[in-house]
Regions:
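A structural signal for multi-pass alpha-helical bundles of membrane permease subunits
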Residues: 30-318
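Short, Lys/Arg-rich, polar N-terminal cytosolic tail immediately upstream
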Residues: 1-28
């Protein structure tokens, strides 16, 4: 006969031994949750970003005729033809000039945002909306409006110039010397709204105590702007510099809407993306067009990397 206490002991013993071998869960372990959340995003990036880049690199090493067919591997012949062409140098120069002019809108946006955020100013929200509204409009539609403004005969700009004594104002969008400058002014104007919103948010994050301390020390309003506002606003300025530079290298829609293809100024205003469009879809040389796309990608990567390396000298992260 088995004693009841013995049965109880035999029942408890395995539980105690089993619990002794149980592994304690690491409180810092998160398991597979990061992979579950990041995995779909990384898969989408690989499919929609990295794979097209790889396919474009492969296409740039091949020669395809206008009617398709079997592409022929030509190695770096497309790149040799591209770098020997004066069209590439002209397109790079036009793209850089446009980008530099549009970048001038950032200090202008800093001034506008600083005026909007002045203490005691009423209707700040209304001013932000008014500056941001052009950014919400369709770029092609706004470009058509500016095309009318730039019209050489009855455009608003030339009417104003004639009223102040300029007897022979230029035909802005037809003259090769003025067309790119006119498009760049449109790009500068179009960037103001987005810039002001970003900079206004940055200005609102600056503690007011810093201005009060600077005022007690006798700093003027201009010195406060230079020594307090600009350094603490530098992360927002750096972000806008990156975004504006990338947008400048992607110039196409404004040129296409305002200059067109039959304009005598078109060859002098052709950007890198315009050159890509012309080679790939007008001349039907997809291999050369792919080579232009790779050059654009490389230039944007180099310029962006240089900006990130240089930002350590002037960007202040508090």
């Amino acid at each position: 006969m088995i004693h009841p206490g013995t049965r109880g002991d035999t029942a408890v013993a395995p539980l105690s031994s089993r619990s002794g071998h149980r592994k304690k869960k690491d409180p810092t372990s998160v398991g597979a949750w990061p992979a579950l959340f990041i995995g779909p995003l990384m898969l989408g990036i690989a499919v929609f970003y990295y794979w097209p880049i790889f396919e474009n690199v492969v296409a740039s090493l091949k020669q395809t005729n206008a009617f398709g067919g079997n592409p022929q591997f030509v190695g770096f012949e497309n790149y040799r033809e591209l770098f020997a062409s004066p069209d590439l140098r002209s397109a790079i120069g036009n793209t850089l000039l446009y980008t530099v002019i549009v970048l001038l809108g950032i200090p202008l946006s800093v001034a506008v945002a600083a005026m909007i955020e002045l203490p005691g100013l009423r209707f700040k929200g209304l001013y932000r909306i008014l500056y941001f509204m052009p950014y919400l409009a369709m770029p092609m539609a706004v470009a058509q409006v500016w095309k009318i403004v730039y019209n050489g005969q009855f455009g608003l700009l030339n009417q104003i110039l004639r009223s102040v004594g300029v007897s022979d104002p230029p035909c802005w969008l037809v003259s090769p010397g003025w067309a790119l400058f006119a498009v760049a002014l449109f790009g500068l104007w179009a960037s103001i709204g987005f810039n002001v919103i970003i900079l206004s948010a940055g200005l609102k994050s600056i503690p007011r105590e810093l201005y009060e301390a600077a005022s007690i020390d006798g700093a003027s309003a201009w010195r406060q702007f230079r020594m307090v506002t600009v350094p603490l606003l530098s992360p927002s300025i750096f972000f806008l510099t990156i975004m504006t530079t990338i947008g400048g290298f992607q110039l196409f829609d404004a040129l296409y809407a305002m200059i067109g293809t039959g304009n005598p100024a078109e060859p002098r205003t052709r950007s890198l993306v315009s050159l890509f469009y012309r080679q790939a879809f007008v001349n039907h040389d997809q291999g050369l067009g792919a080579a232009v796309a790779i050059v654009i990608f490389a230039l944007v990567a180099i310029v962006t990397l240089a900006q990130f390396l240089g930002q350590k000298r002037w960007v202040n992260y508090v």
